Amino acid sequence: MRLILLGPPGAGKGTQAQILVEKLHIPQLSTGDMLRAAVKAETEIGKKAKAVMDAGELVSDAIVNAIVAERIDQPDCANGFILDGYPRTLAQADAVEAMLGERGLKLDAVIELVVDDKALVGRIMKRAEDAQAAGQPVRRDDNPEVFEERLREYYKKTAPLVGYYYAKGLLKGVDGMASIDEVTRQIEGILAKA
C-alpha cells in the first residue's frame, strides 16, 4: 500500500499516519526525518543537503526528490509506505509519479483530510494550551500568526495537488473534523477498496 496523506497543517495527517503505520505495518516517510537521516548517514545526497542547510538555504526539490527516491528503495518500503508532508508542490507530485514509474510501482491512494480553517485555528490553539498546561514546550508553529502563514503557504503551493490527484482518480476525501477514530475508519474504508 503506497499512499499520500494531504491536508493543511493541523488537519491530523501525522496522527493518522502513526495509526496507519501500526495497522498496515508500513513506514511513514517524512521528508524532514529523511533529510536528517541522509545527513547523519553521510550519503552522497545527504552531504549535498547538509551543505545547503548549513548555508541556511531551503533544500531544493531535486535534493528532496533524490532523498525520497533513496528512501523508498529501502527494504522496509517493499510493501508500501505513507508519504506525509510530501509532495508539497505539483513538481514534486510529478517526481513521485516518475520515481514510482521507474520502479514499476504506483500510488494506491491519496487521502485528503478535509477540514474547516476556523476550526483548525481553534484546534491549534487548544494544542498550544494543552502543551502549556502539561508543562511542555509549545511548538513554534502553534502560534496563531505562524500557523496562519503556514495555512496561506499550504493553499498557495500544496492545495493544487488536490486537483492533480483528483484528475488521476486517486484522491479520496475524509472528514478531518471527525473524531480521530472516525477519521481512521473512513481511511480504512477507502484503503479496503484501493
UniProtKB/Swiss-Prot annotation:
Alphabetic keyword roster: ATP-binding, Cytoplasm, Kinase, Nucleotide biosynthesis, Nucleotide-binding, Transferase
Catalytic activity: AMP + ATP = 2 ADP
Description of how the protein assembles with itself and partners: Monomer.
Any GO BP: AMP salvage
Family: Belongs to the adenylate kinase family.
Listed name of the protein: Adenylate kinase
Region annotated LID, chain positions: 126-142
Pathway: Purine metabolism; AMP biosynthesis via salvage pathway; AMP from ADP: step 1/1
GO cellular component: cytoplasm
Region (NMP): 30-59
PROSITE patterns, alphabetized: ADENYLATE_KINASE (PS00113)
Enzyme Commission (EC) number: 2.7.4.3
Origin: domain of life: Bacteria
